[in-house]
């Protein structure tokens, strides 16, 4: 199993020192990160940062980390640089602005998701990410439902790959 504390689930009474054993055993850490967009309880923001930094502080285990960045992309990218862990970081469904992405060009991986066939901003972001740093994801069946009202199935990943290829003018074989 994969271990992480999603920013939507962060509470002020989390005893972070108790999680190191879980992190040690997990092949990947995530989804962790910050969300200053969907999380309306601003008092949790400092706790989110604390949990996020704690997850990065155990990088002595050299794990890949799946990171949620909604509404605080620049802060996240700066924290990733601070902890010098960008090669192990996967930025989940980046939707920040292109300038932040360019200014904070790092060696992270980024995911493209089910919105690529529908949202121009997402298409523009995907064009900015080097193909060798791009991964595809569906973010679960309800993500597509959020985008177009249709409940997504696992094979939706094929459409994500096709959209990545169309946007970047690539053949599917070039993504291997």
Please annotate each region the language model reported.
Residues 107-121:
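His/Asp/Glu-enriched short active-site or ligand-binding loop at hydrolase and phosphoryl-transfer sites
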Residues 133-138, 144-176:
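His/Asp/Glu-enriched, well-ordered alpha-helical/loop segment
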Residues 7-11, 70-73, 94-97, 114-118:
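Short beta->alpha connector loops
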Residues 2-4, 29-30, 64-67, 90-91, ...:
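Active-site neighborhood of phospho(di)ester-bond hydrolases with catalytic His/Asp-centered motifs
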Residues 1, 31, 125-126, 139, ...:
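Conserved, mostly hydrophobic/aromatic
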Residues 17-106, 124, 143-151, 155, ...:
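Divalent metal-binding pocket/active-site signature
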Residues 1-18:
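A metal-dependent hydrolase metal-coordination microenvironment
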């Amino acid at each position: 199993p994969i271990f992480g504390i999603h920013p939507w689930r962060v509470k002020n009474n989390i005893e972070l020192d108790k999680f190191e054993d879980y992190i040690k055993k997990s092949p990947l850490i995530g989804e962790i990160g910050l969300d200053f967009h969907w999380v309306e309880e601003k008092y949790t923001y400092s706790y989110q940062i604390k949990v996020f930094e704690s997850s990065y502080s155990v990088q002595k285990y050299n794990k890949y980390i799946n990171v949620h960045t909604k509404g605080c992309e620049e802060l996240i990218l700066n924290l990733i640089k601070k902890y010098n862990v960008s090669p192990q970081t996967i930025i989940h469904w980046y939707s920040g602005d292109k300038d932040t992405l360019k200014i904070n060009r790092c060696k992270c991986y980024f995911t493209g998701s089910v919105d690529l066939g529908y949202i121009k901003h997402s298409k523009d972001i995907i064009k900015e990410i080097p193909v060798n740093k791009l991964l595809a994801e569906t973010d679960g069946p309800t993500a597509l439902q959020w985008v177009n009202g249709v409940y997504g199935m696992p094979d939706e990943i094929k459409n994500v790959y096709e959209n990545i290829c169309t946007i970047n003018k690539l053949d599917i074989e070039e993504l291997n």
